[in-house]
Amino acid sequence: MRSALCSVLLCGVAFGAAAQEREVTFEETPPVSITGFAVGRADYDRVARTNGFTAGKVGVSLFKPAGDAYVFAQLTTALDGAGEAATEIDNLLVSWTPRTANQWTLAFGRFDAPIGFERDDEPLNLIPTNSFNFSYARPGKLTGVQVHYTASPRLDLWAVAANGWDVAVDNNRGKTALARAQFIPIPWVTVGVTGVYGPEQASTDRQQRSLLSSDLTVDRGPLILGAELNLGRERTSGSANATWRGAAGTVFLRVARKLGVTARYDQMEDTDGLLTGTPQILRSVTVGPMWYSSSAREGIFSNIEHTRFHLPQIALRAAVRADWSSQPLFADASGALQGANTTGVLELVYVF
């Protein structure tokens, strides 16, 4: 009996010593969250005389918190212009926010450029097509390092060093710098000013490009207004500069609990042809309704940018878009270029 008691005591001492060497916790390790979205479309092109259905895009996202940091990755498979499917790393972000200085965040990877109102993924927009300003006048994606500082509940600052505009692998030795200030003067208004500077042409650092971009978001009751202005230039040779400017405005009005109407006007003046390859002025008007239902799961992207509009799980959007160019641009059925075109889109977006 005495021997058995000694054995129990010795086991207890051994267990206590092991517990001192290793912290015992009953907290569960945070799981990896898997989310994503799928997009199906029906398109009509008046000038090209084409129409068809496409299962256009699937995006799968992984989110893993780890203490003060998290990892977010998104793989996107989409159809290109030739109808071939291609998969790319759309986002890959390692982010760290220290507990003792949680107003600072350091992030590295590939991420959405903190500019403007529009984004590249369909669930993050209110209308099923992107503007000319988003496509040409400013970067949509950056690959590099980002520092975010929350100076106050109303003021946020960003600084970014990246490879360049929408490039995953650097095409020259220089780097692109971005600085942004975002201010909330009243709870339903957000104002942002962004400057971008750096070489963007392949194999040379001499042709520096600069961009000044400002954006305004108003989220008031049933109305959302998103607007942006872009002014840019690039040194071409010697002291010569190519310039461009553009503006886009989007208005969304909620007319019922699950129904809204969106309209957008977009103008981009590429008078030197640097961005589009042809000196021209591009304009577009897009109008259409959106029916939406349920709320998508919480994640790194939960709302339309700078608004309280929570991403719906299901959204059915239709739009008619009229495009104009000061030069023949839109190919018709015979291959000839026309100066105007009208397209129609019916898009289903499902977030899972």
Show the residue positions of the predicted features.
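Intrinsic disorder/low-complexity segments
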Residues: 5, 15-19, 34, 53, ...
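Short glycine/proline-enriched turns and hinge-like loops at secondary-structure junctions
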Residues: 85-87, 170-174, 206-207, 240-243
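Outer-membrane beta-barrel pore domains
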Residues: 46-48, 92-96, 110, 119, ...
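Outer membrane beta-barrel
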Residues: 21-166, 173-178, 182-191, 250-262, ...
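N-terminal periplasmic/intermembrane-space "pro-region" immediately following the signal or transit peptide
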Residues: 5-44, 297-304, 347, 352
